[in-house]
């Protein structure tokens, strides 16, 4: 499903709550399965903010695989952090910590947080925007 009224932010976080409206993006189920993604684990929404630019533009549609929520260093994840919905690169650190990194590092410095304070929703595996 495409959660049209929902946004994740690449900036400092968003309080938007998912609300499915029936709209779907054209991912073929067979294509997703070939990539090891179960179609029932996928949702799409909009990313707002410039912290992931040049990689993912403000306003891009993103696809999230909720079945892939174990952190693999350097991958992009949708996650909840202190009740904010965010999209960033995540990497595990020693001592039960996680590194939170934006693509636009000049504006958004790297952060660290406790793994306990992070709820990984899923890995962002696709994005698209028309400019």
Language model features by range: what are they?
Residues 51-55, 67-70, 115:
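Short, surface-exposed secondary-structure edge patches
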Residues 1-58, 121, 126-131:
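Short, positionally conserved secondary-structure boundary motifs
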Residues 102-131:
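Amphipathic alpha-helical interface segments
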Residues 92-97, 129-131:
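Short, conserved beta-turn/loop elements at beta-strand boundaries and strand-helix junctions
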Residues 79, 100-102:
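SH3/SH3-like beta-barrel fold
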């Amino acid at each position: 499903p495409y959660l049209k009224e929902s946004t994740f932010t690449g900036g400092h976080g968003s309080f938007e709550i998912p609300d499915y409206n029936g709209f779907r993006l054209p991912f073929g189920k067979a294509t997703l399965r070939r990539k090891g993604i179960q179609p029932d684990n996928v949702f799409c929404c909009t990313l707002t903010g410039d912290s992931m630019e040049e990689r993912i533009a403000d306003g891009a549609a993103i696809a999230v695989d909720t079945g892939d929520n174990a952190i693999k260093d350097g991958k992009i994840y949708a996650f909840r952090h202190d009740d904010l919905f965010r999209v960033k690169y995540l990497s595990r650190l020693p001592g039960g910590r996680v590194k939170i990194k934006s693509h636009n590092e000049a504006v958004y410095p790297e952060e660290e947080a406790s793994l306990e304070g992070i709820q990984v929703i899923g890995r962002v595996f696709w994005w698209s925007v028309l400019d």
